[in-house]
């Protein structure tokens, strides 16, 4: 590669240049660009190593590019291939979706960078013809008896997001209204991902476990 650089421009002492002038700035850019072309380039060296003498002569013509030269040498296809996307089986994708679904979604309570307070629950209620109809006001009155409520966000006609001041009050609400029945026409569940996880306890030898605890802590 022939690059014309005047050595006198590099080593001759000159007065400080005013780079505010477009001509000086353009001249400096061209000089640095020419110097950059002289730096060693490993990729170009590899490309030149695959060239034959005939290729070197033809490469002077604009219709011959480096891509055509590489294609003529039949290099491995892997050098131009991007990695394939990872294929997730349908059964594994379903498990991942179920884990993500533990975060109970609400149209007005979207998942964001922060998690809801520990005392946040989702309240759902239904209406029946033979039972007094529940509404948001009556549901909040019943939940207020379990503890102080910070905020209430309606989420549809028959659901809302309720935030208690403390997690103990939320525990009472979830324990008292786990399932809908004839007496209770509304249901409470956890909004926080940690609190909504199902926890299984050992029921096989409960008496043995309690006995071991008593021995360790008399």
From Swiss-Prot:
This is Testis expressed protein 56. InterPro entries: RBD_domain_sf (IPR035979), Tex56 (IPR027827). The gene is Tex56. It comes from Rattus norvegicus (Rat). Pfam families: DUF4523. It comes from the Eukaryota. One of its GO terms (molecular function) is nucleic acid binding.
């Amino acid at each position: 590669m022939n690059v014309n650089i005047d050595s006198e421009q590099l080593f001759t002492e000159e007065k400080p240049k005013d780079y505010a002038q477009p001509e000086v700035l353009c001249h400096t850019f061209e000089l640095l660009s020419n110097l950059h072309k002289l730096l060693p380039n490993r990729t170009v060296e590899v490309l030149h190593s695959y060239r034959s003498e005939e290729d070197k002569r033809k490469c002077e013509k604009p219709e011959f590019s480096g891509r055509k030269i590489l294609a003529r040498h039949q290099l491995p296809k892997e050098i131009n291939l991007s990695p394939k996307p990872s294929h997730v089986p349908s059964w594994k994708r379903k498990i991942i979706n179920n884990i993500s679904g533990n975060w109970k979604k609400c149209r007005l309570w979207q998942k964001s960078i922060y998690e809801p307070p520990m005392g946040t629950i989702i309240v759902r209620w239904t209406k029946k013809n033979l039972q007094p109809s529940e509404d948001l006001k009556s549901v909040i009155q019943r939940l207020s008896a379990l503890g102080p409520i910070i905020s209430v966000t309606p989420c549809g006609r028959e659901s809302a997001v309720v935030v208690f001041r403390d997690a103990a009050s939320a525990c009472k609400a979830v324990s008292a209204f786990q399932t809908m029945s004839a007496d209770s026409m509304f249901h409470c569940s956890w909004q926080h991902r940690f609190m909504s996880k199902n926890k299984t306890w050992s029921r096989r030898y409960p008496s043995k476990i309690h006995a071991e605890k008593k021995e360790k802590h008399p």
